[in-house]
Amino acid sequence: MSCNETIILKTRELTREVPKNGSVIRTVDSLTFEFNKGLVYNVVGPSGAGKSSFLRLLNRLDEPTGGEVLYYDKPVTSYAPTDLRRKISMLFQIPYLFPGTVRDNLSFCCSGKQEFDADFHLRRVGLKAEYADMGADDLSVGEKQRVALARSLFLEPDVLLLDEPTSALDPTSSRKIEELILSLARELCLTVIMVTHNPDQALRLGGKGLLMVKGKLIESGDTAELLTDPSSDLGRRYVSKELE
């Protein structure tokens, strides 16, 4: 069985409800989907669609109020949260690095490892070896995002969750991160699930797309088809920018 034929992550009727203004709203509403290993998935939709809320349920940063997430056919609740997040890692809009050097940040997740090659992990995300001894506070946002990515990859995750990781970057840096994501997905057979508010970015990344509106999965398929020839009325309204 090839890399892309393996189903690595499933959601079944996944639901999350949160209190708001004295009532309860569903940020994720009965969402069922299967993710294959080694593919890139773009989660798109208008603001308030529940995209980030959905992402946070996949590695238990938040807990659902209904349904379940399965990782290799086992409920994610059967894994210790720390162990689960090593295999289903997440990067956020603003990268967080610990005080100290880049090397300190990389070695933080590597306790118990007999050998640690900072140069290798930096090169893998497109940074030169001399970055290892630079202070984390001296890096640009784009460089910090690469270091955060290198730190996640050291743990050899199967799934990488990305919550708008380029939203704070300039267009050139954003393109470089996009190219890096695609390269790593191919090289490592890594499943990438990325939330983006930018349809053009989703088109550049390609792969598969999921359109969410008001917590519901409206349609899914090839990203290019989803964003150029959607099959649903809500999909057409989203593409024509009627949904904000």
Briefly describe each language-model feature range.
Residues N59:
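Helix-to-loop junction immediately C-terminal to a conserved catalytic motif
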Residues G67-P75, L84:
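Conserved ABC transporter NBD signature motif
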Residues E115-Y131:
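Conserved ABC ATPase "signature" region
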Residues G135-L139, E143:
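Conserved ABC ATPase signature
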Residues L160-D163:
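Catalytic Walker B motif of ABC-type/P-loop ATPase nucleotide-binding domains
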Residues P171-S173:
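Helix N-cap at the start of a conserved alpha-helix in ABC-type nucleotide-binding domains
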Residues A224-E244:
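C-terminal boundary and immediately downstream tail of ABC-type ATPase nucleotide-binding domains
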